[in-house]
């Protein structure tokens, strides 16, 4: 598949969402709401569910599947209260010894005036800091777009995976082209240079696994992700805490 098709597929409105994966993979998934400071951000969803006999905290960025839903979800662009909600749930997971699984699909954090006034940069930075030392296993999965710091704020993890037709980048191809050439129409040319596809990033050791989507129905893809999670969480849970944290630290220091 060429780069233009991959970018279109990553942004496709019909792609599986965080809630599709959360309810399809985890039994008895219960959503939790709010950051306990300002409000509940519809762009970030999270809660607790069971993976076999293991309780897991699930957090992710939610895009809508219709215009009405996208307005509710702010088109998957979190406000600072969304990142603070995510951090609240991750710290709760740490307190009770639950592993964390994050699902990421965002063009980036919301850049509006209100978001900046409420500390968007601080909220993202704090998530990076806290996740780097969170004392439970973390797996992050990019399921569509992984855009800039808005995606990275949920991706400081022991394992970072990508669905095959997802992308992960410092900014959008359109933004890159506008900055580099002052011409947003050269976005796909920029995408080729940026190396944003799953297989390119796996080759560069930015991500640890690419989960195939080819020929799989939605149910089959969810089942595949569930199987991978069960295997990897069991493996990570066996690691001594000091080793887990040191490997996570070294994973990101090497960049």
UniProtKB/Swiss-Prot annotation:
GO molecular function: acetyl-CoA carboxylase activity; ATP binding; carboxyl- or carbamoyltransferase activity
Keywords for the protein's UniProt record, in alphabetical order: ATP-binding, Cytoplasm, Fatty acid biosynthesis, Fatty acid metabolism, Lipid biosynthesis, Lipid metabolism, Nucleotide-binding, Transferase
InterPro entries: Acetyl_CoA_COase_a_su, ClpP/crotonase-like_dom_sf, COA_CT_C
GO biological process, one term: fatty acid biosynthetic process
Listed EC numbers: 2.1.3.15
Inhibition and activation profile: Inhibited by pyrrolidine dione antibiotic moiramide B (CPD1).
Annotated CoA carboxyltransferase C-terminal domain residues: 1-235
Family matches, as PANTHER family: ACETYL-COENZYME A CARBOXYLASE CARBOXYL TRANSFERASE SUBUNIT ALPHA, ACETYL-COENZYME A CARBOXYLASE CARBOXYL TRANSFERASE SUBUNIT ALPHA, CHLOROPLASTIC
Record note on quaternary structure: Acetyl-CoA carboxylase is a heterohexamer composed of biotin carboxyl carrier protein (AccB), biotin carboxylase (AccC) and two subunits each of ACCase subunit alpha (AccA) and ACCase subunit beta (AccD).
Identification of the protein by name: Acetyl-coenzyme A carboxylase carboxyl transferase subunit alpha
Taxonomic placement: Bacteria, Bacillati, Bacillota, Bacilli, Lactobacillales
């Amino acid at each position: 598949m060429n780069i233009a098709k991959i970018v279109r597929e990553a942004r496709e409105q019909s792609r599986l969402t965080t809630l599709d994966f959360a309810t399809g993979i985890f039994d008895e998934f219960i959503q939790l709401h709010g950051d306990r400071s300002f409000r509940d951000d519809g762009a970030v969803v999270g809660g607790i569910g069971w993976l076999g006999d293991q309780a897991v905290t699930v957090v992710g960025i939610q895009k809508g599947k219709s215009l009405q839903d996208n307005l509710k979800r702010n088109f998957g662009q979190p406000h600072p209260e969304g990142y603070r909600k995510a951090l609240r749930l991750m710290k709760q997971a740490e307190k009770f010894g639950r592993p964390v699984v994050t699902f990421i699909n965002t063009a980036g954090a919301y850049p509006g005036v209100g978001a900046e006034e409420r500390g968007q940069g601080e909220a993202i930075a704090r998530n990076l800091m806290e996740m780097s030392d969170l004392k439970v296993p973390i797996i992050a999965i990019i399921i569509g777009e992984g855009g800039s710091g808005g995606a990275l704020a949920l991706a400081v993890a022991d394992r970072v995976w990508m669905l095959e037709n997802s992308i992960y980048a410092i900014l959008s191809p359109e933004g890159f082209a506008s900055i580099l050439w002052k011409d947003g129409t050269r976005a796909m040319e920029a995408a080729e240079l940026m190396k944003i596809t799953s297989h390119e990033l796996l080759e560069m050791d930015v991500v640890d696994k690419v989960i195939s989507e080819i020929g799989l129905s939605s149910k089959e893809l969810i089942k595949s992700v569930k199987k991978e999670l069960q295997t990897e969480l069991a493996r990570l849970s066996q690691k001594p805490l000091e080793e887990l944290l040191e490997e996570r630290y070294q994973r990101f220091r090497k960049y």
